[in-house]
Amino acid sequence: MKISKMQVHNIRSILDCTINMADYSVLIGQNNVGKSNILAALRLFYDKIKFNDAEDFPKIQTTDNESWVEITFSTTESEQALLKEEYKTADGFLKLRRIFKTDNKDFPIKASNSNIFAYEHGVLSNRNFYGAKNVSLGKIGDLIYIPAVNKIEDI
C-alpha cells in the first residue's frame, strides 16, 4: 500500500489541508508554516504519538469540534484481494479516517479502539476498521519516523 492522499482536519495549526502524495514527496516551506504539524498528523494516524486535546486541537477558532486524519491508500490487486469485501473498491483505493475527537455520537471514540474508520461503498462507516486496534493498525503498514538531529552526539 502506498499513501496517495492525506487530509488533515483540525490538527494543531492545520484547520483543513489536503496533500496529494507521489512515490517520493517533499514538504518545503518557510519556518512556522506547519510542515512539522503535517508530520505530526501522520504520526498521530499511525499511533506513533498520542492525541492530546490541549496540544493537538487548534487554538484558533474552528468550524466544528472534530479532529481527524484521513489517508487514501493505493493498493495492488493482491492487496485488494486480502481486504474484507466491504473495503474492496474497483479503483484500488482504500480510504481510512482516524478520528481523534468528535461530538458525533455515531462514531464511538474509545482509547481501547484504533478509532480508524473505513469508507465502505463510498460512505464513511461508523464501524472500526477490522475491529481490534492491533489488527487494524497491522493492516496499514508502519511508519518510520527519523527525527531531526541537532548535535553530532545525538547520532
Question: What feature does the model see in each segment?
Answer:
Residues 5-7, 18, 68-72, 95-97:
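Beta-strand secondary-structure signal
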Residues 9, 22, 72-76, 101:
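Solvent-exposed residues in well-ordered beta-strands and their adjoining turns
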Residues 1-47, 57-59:
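Pre-Walker A-like glycine/lysine-rich segment at the N-terminus of P-loop NTPase domains
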Residues 37, 50-63, 77-155:
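Glycine-rich phosphate-binding loops of NTPases
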Residues 40, 64-74:
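Conserved long hydrophobic alpha-helices within structured protein cores
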